[in-house]
């Protein structure tokens, strides 16, 4: 499809003979504007980038179309045979282009219709080539695309756009029935098949309903449509043994039969469903006419349902009994497992208590042995120190007296007095330490007597005993509490307040009888003056 400037220029040149398409030689213009190959105008197109008159370097000028066809065959000028590598090596003859644009008159490119067949409703303006740009921007016959929708590819003239916009297939319109927005070309199908508010005539009763309500009318309300009896779905065989079977032969008897109440007492009574077809308007008459038969069907259905309900109730009761029995078994097994678990835990607790008691006794005995060893070491150190000081003082005084006899009597007397004072101070310190040790051992011996008495009492009562006294029943049952009480510092009675010595505050101990200790703890100081 060629529009406007796409049309070849020879179709727009004004000539007297209108058969120009059949004979191009009848076009009258100067030979200077004529192509020597095709004998047409040197400007073959009105498109800006193709409106050229190209020539070689020797000035041989041809139209653009001829140059393209020549270079496809051979890369040389057909006149001078000069080599031409490409179209870019050719030059544009601006003088010829200007002369043709000012002198040659043509029809407006919108003169012809878009199919180039005729000039119906075309532009009648006659212009020169250089006036095309100015005229084409204002021409009422120029070709444009539809601006309503991008899907519309129709090309129309500018002066016909209003008419096309009112008839375009892609214009959006509202349905007159449901106000839904629909394209023009789809409106007819929307009204015939989709619109829910369009009125449609019922085929049975000739009444009009909207498409939205028509289906409901046909299924539930139309009085002229034929329907089945509602009792057709009842397919039952009733007998005295209450055996429920499905009756597959639904078309054996006509629904107009009526069964008397005496017939129910027979052994086996086949009841076929009601298969009659009738108009909905005649349904009430059908119910009145066959009400006895329908009632018998309903009574049989009710009896059947009652039997099913009874069976279900018995099944539920049996399930409840079984469930209760299972629950009782589970509870009993749980109680047995719980009792066995408690017994095992009791045994474990008892073992733990025994172990804790043994650990506490061993720890306490170890502490007593450590304290006893420390006291004996300190006593040994003090005894050795006192013996050493007495021997050194005697030797030092004798040596000093001999030396002082050789010196002046006054100086010797003063030195002897000072040395005697020092010896007296040291002896007083040793005597004080020995007194404190004597008091300490007295308290230890007293505590030992008390402990022996407690051991005798414990043996009589058969209770566990520690150096802190007999354990109570609560302490035996709770070894953790016993351990906490023993680990805490004990408050000593007033009778044992004198058991503090140079080593600080300590808990009373019992001296192991198996150790080789002297009966008199101060026998190690024999030979020394206390």
UniProtKB/Swiss-Prot annotation:
Q: Which UniProt keywords apply?
A: Coiled coil, Cytoplasm, Metal-binding, Repeat, Zinc, Zinc-finger
Specify where it is mainly localized.
cytoplasm
Q: Which domain of life is it from?
A: Eukaryota
Q: Per the database entry, which stretches of residues form a coiled coil?
A: 361-422
**Region entry Disordered, spans:** 242-267, 391-432, 483-530
Q: Which InterPro entries does the record associate with it?
A: Znf_RING (IPR001841), Znf_RING/FYVE/PHD (IPR013083), Znf_TRAF (IPR001293)
Task: Quote the biased-composition stretches of kind Low complexity, using this chain's numbering.
Answer: 253-267, 391-415, 485-502
Single GO MF annotation = zinc ion binding
ZnF segments: RING-type: 35-81
List cellular component terms (GO).
cytoplasm
Localized where?
A: Cytoplasm
Where in the sequence does UniProt note compositional bias of the Polar residues kind? 509-530
Q: Zinc finger regions typed TRAF-type: which residues?
A: 134-188, 189-246
Per the entry, what this protein does is:
Probable adapter protein and signal transducer that links members of the tumor necrosis factor receptor family to different signaling pathways by association with the receptor cytoplasmic domain and kinases.
* Family recorded in the similarity comment: Belongs to the TNF receptor-associated factor family.
Quoted from the entry, the domain comment is:
The MATH/TRAF domain binds to receptor cytoplasmic domains.
What name does this protein carry?
A: TNF receptor-associated factor family protein DDB_G0272829
Q: Say which species the protein is native to.
A: Dictyostelium discoideum (Social amoeba)
């Amino acid at each position: 499809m060629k529009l406007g400037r796409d049309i070849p220029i020879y179709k727009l040149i004004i000539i007297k003979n209108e058969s120009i398409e059949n004979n191009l030689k009848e076009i009258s213009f100067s030979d200077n504007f004529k192509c020597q190959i095709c004998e047409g105008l040197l400007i073959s197109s009105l498109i800006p980038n193709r409106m050229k008159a190209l020539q070689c370097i020797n000035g041989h000028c041809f139209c653009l179309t001829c140059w393209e066809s020549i270079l496809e065959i051979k890369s040389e000028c057909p006149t001078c045979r000069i080599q031409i590598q490409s179209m870019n090596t050719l030059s544009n003859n601006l003088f010829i282009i200007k002369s043709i644009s000012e002198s040659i008159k043509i029809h407006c490119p919108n003169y012809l219709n878009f199919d180039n067949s005729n000039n119906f409703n075309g532009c009648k303006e006659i212009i020169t080539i250089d006036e095309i740009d100015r005229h084409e921007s204002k021409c009422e016959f120029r070709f444009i695309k539809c601006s309503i929708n991008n899907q519309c590819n129709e090309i129309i003239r500018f002066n016909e756009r209003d008419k096309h916009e009112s008839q375009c297939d892609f214009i959006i319109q509202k349905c007159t029935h449901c106000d839904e927005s629909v394209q023009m070309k789809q409106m007819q199908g929307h009204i015939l098949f989709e619109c829910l508010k369009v009125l449609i005539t019922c085929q049975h009763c000739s009444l009009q309903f909207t498409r939205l309500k028509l289906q409901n009318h046909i299924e539930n309300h139309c009085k002229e449509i034929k329907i089945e009896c509602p009792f057709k779905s009842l397919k039952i065989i009733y007998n005295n043994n209450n055996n429920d079977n499905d009756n597959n032969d639904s078309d054996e008897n006509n629904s107009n039969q009526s069964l008397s109440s005496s017939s129910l007492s027979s052994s086996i009574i086949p009841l076929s469903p009601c298969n009659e077809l009738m108009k909905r308007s005649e349904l009430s008459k059908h119910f009145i006419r066959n009400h006895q038969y329908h009632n018998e069907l309903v009574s049989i259905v009710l009896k059947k349902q009652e039997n099913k309900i009874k069976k279900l109730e018995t099944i539920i009761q049996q399930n409840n009994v079984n469930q209760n029995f299972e629950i009782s078994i589970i509870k009993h097994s749980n109680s047995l497992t719980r009792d066995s678990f408690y017994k095992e835990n009791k045994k474990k607790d008892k073992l733990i208590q025994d172990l804790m008691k043994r650990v506490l006794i061993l720890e306490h005995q170890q502490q007593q042995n450590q304290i006893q060893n420390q006291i004996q070491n300190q006593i040994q150190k003090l005894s050795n120190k006192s013996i050493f000081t007495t021997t050194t003082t005697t030797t030092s005084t004798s040596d000093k007296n001999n030396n002082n006899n050789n010196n002046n009597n006054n100086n010797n007397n003063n030195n002897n007095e000072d040395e005697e004072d020092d010896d007296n101070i040291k002896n007083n310190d040793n005597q004080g330490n020995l007194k404190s040790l004597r008091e300490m051992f007295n308290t230890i011996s007293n505590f030992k007597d008390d402990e022996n008495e407690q051991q005798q009492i414990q043996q009589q009562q058969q209770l566990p005993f520690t150096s802190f006294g007999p354990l109570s029943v609560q302490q035996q049952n709770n070894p953790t509490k016993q351990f906490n009480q023993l680990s805490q510092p004990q408050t000593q009675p007033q009778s044992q307040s004198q058991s503090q010595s140079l080593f600080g505050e300590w808990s009373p101990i019992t001296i192991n009888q198996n150790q080789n200790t002297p009966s008199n703890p101060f026998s190690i100081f024999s030979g020394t003056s206390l």
